[in-house]
Swiss-Prot record:
SMART domains: PGAM (SM00855). The lineage of its organism: Eukaryota, Metazoa, Ecdysozoa, Arthropoda, Hexapoda. This is Serine/threonine-protein phosphatase Pgam5, mitochondrial. GO terms for biological process: positive regulation of mitochondrial fission; positive regulation of mitochondrial fusion; protein dephosphorylation; response to anesthetic; response to heat. Its main location: mitochondrion. It is found in: Mitochondrion outer membrane. It comes from Drosophila yakuba. Interacts with Pk92B/ASK1. Belongs to the phosphoglycerate mutase family. BPG-dependent PGAM subfamily.
């Protein structure tokens, strides 16, 4: 009986301490609704159906009245504004490169970086994709990666779109911040608006007249790709630096006709041998493969 009383008292004291802690620090509470409720806890968890400003209801003139003729007009225009097919956007990070000198002209791929790009090109060829569009950043390392990939897939080099908006940069101050990388606020302002403009240029649901699924290949940079992933999935964009992707890795996002976005690959590099898996700039130039 004495043991039972001791157990009950101890348990009660534990619950009391837990309850008092909850009152003092409500942010530390674990919400059961995170796991068993269909109602999101935080507003940002709600999906914005008009994220690309192409939601049919946002493009069509609203109903003016409830007359059958007006409803028929509205429904016809609504149907005409709807996308019919999905868009697939495949993002490839450039291969490993040498960060030698201040000019981008000196930032060429290493031997290992070229091998990485070759493996990526072979992988894309194996997927048997018929590319509708290929876009590459204008930075040297992305251009060289794109050129190597083009040797493996069926696409005319003259049709590649070179886009300065895709150049590497600082998209948005990351959370949590890191001590080893602290660009000036002016750089975030300059790069962030450019990278966001690139996102809006390439990420949107299909146009209504698109009759088949489309495939766009974008050869770019780690920061830009990670920011794109967060924006496309409507995750907090400040979390982009929590993601790590390897050199020449493949990230695949699909935008459905409804505007919903899903991710198929994130930084996939499993098709490369282990010795080619890298994600940082080599510091010792002499030891570069």
């Amino acid at each position: 009986m004495r043991k039972l009383t001791s157990f009950v008292c101890g348990t009660g004291a534990g619950f009391a301490a837990y309850y008092l802690q909850r009152l003092r620090d409500p942010q530390a509470a674990v919400h059961n609704s995170w796991t068993n409720s269909d109602k999101p806890v935080d507003p940002w968890a709600l999906w914005d159906t008009n994220w690309d400003c192409r939601e049919p209801r946002a493009l069509v003139r609203p109903l003016r009245n409830s007359q059958p003729e007006e409803e028929n007009r509205y429904n016809a225009e609504l149907e005409k504004a709807k996308a019919k097919k999905a868009r697939h956007i495949i993002l490839v990070r450039h291969g490993e490169y040498l960060d030698v000198g201040d000019s981008d002209d000196t930032h060429h791929l290493t031997d290992r970086g070229r091998k990485q790009a070759e493996f990526t090109g072979k992988r894309l060829s194996e997927l048997g994709i018929k590319w509708d569009k290929i876009v590459a950043s204008t930075m040297v390392r992305a251009q060289e990666t794109s050129d190597i990939i083009l040797k493996q897939i069926e696409f005319e080099k003259e049709k590649v779109v070179n886009c300065a908006f895709l150049r590497e940069g600082a998209p948005i101050p990351p959370q949590p911040p890191v001590g080893h990388w602290k660009p000036e606020a002016s750089q975030f302002l300059r790069d962030g608006s450019r990278i966001e403009a690139a996102f809006r240029r390439y990420f949107h649901r299909a146009y209504p007249d698109q009759e088949k699924e489309s495939y766009t290949l974008i050869v770019g940079h780690g920061n830009v790709i990670r920011y794109f992933v967060c924006r496309a999935l409507q995750f907090p964009a400040e979390g982009w630096l929590r993601i790590s992707i390897n050199h020449a890795s493949i990230t695949w996002l699909t935008i459905s006709p409804s505007g919903n976005v899903s991710i198929k690959y994130l930084g996939d590099s499993g098709f490369m041998p282990p010795e080619l898996l890298t994600n940082r700039i080599p510091r010792d130039v002499k030891n570069v493969v």
